[in-house]
Amino acid sequence: MSTKVPIYLKRGSRKGKKEKLRDLLSSDMISPPLGDFRHTIHIGSGGGNDTFGDISFLQGKFHLLPGTAVDETQEDSGFEMPFQFTRTATLCGRELPDGPSPLLKNAISLPVIGGPQALTLPAAQAPPKPPRLHLETPQASPQEAGTVDVWRIPEAGAAHSELTTESGAEEPFLSHASSLLSLHVDLGPSILDDVLQIMDQDLGHLQIPT
């Protein structure tokens, strides 16, 4: 066979047997996609009407593209080339045409954050505040802040005495538990008396009569 034929199409060592193309090709011959390959620039057969991407290498010479050649008579008559939505056309300062651009006909613009669209959004309602337990208690003014504890203590004592007289002697513990302003803590038998007695005994032994 000719040397110009690719190596994967050449016959093997077996003679007289025609090999099929699917037997010669394998998936290992297909190179994986390159990570740095990007289709960022495209110039189609239509020339200026079929381009996108960064074509700044043209340096504004759009007449070099196929299909965009304009004769001198059209240039003198004031004929303008159609606007191309490319980076170069935008940087060159070419003005937008009055008519809608075919490239932007089906485009959908996203709302700008903080723009006029943001004013029409419904305001988020704040969550309801939890109920407070001290709403029923009177609020003291800053001038009476020092006397708050003075007039609250008799009120708590009066409520405690009223509950005690109503419940009677049969339920003394309920009167303490029903009052929110009173605190009843039972620490059990106190050992303070025992400690004081031991201290008195030690002092008695230390004092020797003269």
Swiss-Prot record:
Positions carrying Phosphoserine are 31, 101, 141
GO terms (molecular function) for this protein are:
GTPase activator activity; opioid peptide activity; small GTPase binding
Cell compartment(s), UniProt: Endomembrane system; Cytoplasm, Cytoskeleton
Write down a Pfam family by its short name: BORG_CEP
Q: How does it sit in the membrane?
A: Peripheral membrane protein
A single GO BP term for this record reads: regulation of cell shape
> What are the residue boundaries of the CRIB domain, all occurrences included?
30-44
> Which residues are recorded with the post-translational modification N-acetylserine?
2
A single cellular component GO annotation: cytoskeleton
Domain of life according to the entry: Eukaryota
Q: Region Disordered: start and end of each range?
A: 124-145
The record's keywords, sorted A to Z, are: Acetylation, Cell shape, Cytoplasm, Cytoskeleton, Membrane, Phosphoprotein
Name the protein family.
Belongs to the BORG/CEP family.
Q: What the record says about its domains?
A: The CRIB domain mediates interaction with CDC42.
Report the protein's function: Probably involved in the organization of the actin cytoskeleton. May act downstream of CDC42 to induce actin filament assembly leading to cell shape changes. Induces pseudopodia formation in fibroblasts in a CDC42-dependent manner.
Q: How does it assemble?
A: Interacts with CDC42 and RHOQ, in a GTP-dependent manner, and with SEPT7.
Protein name per the record: Cdc42 effector protein 2
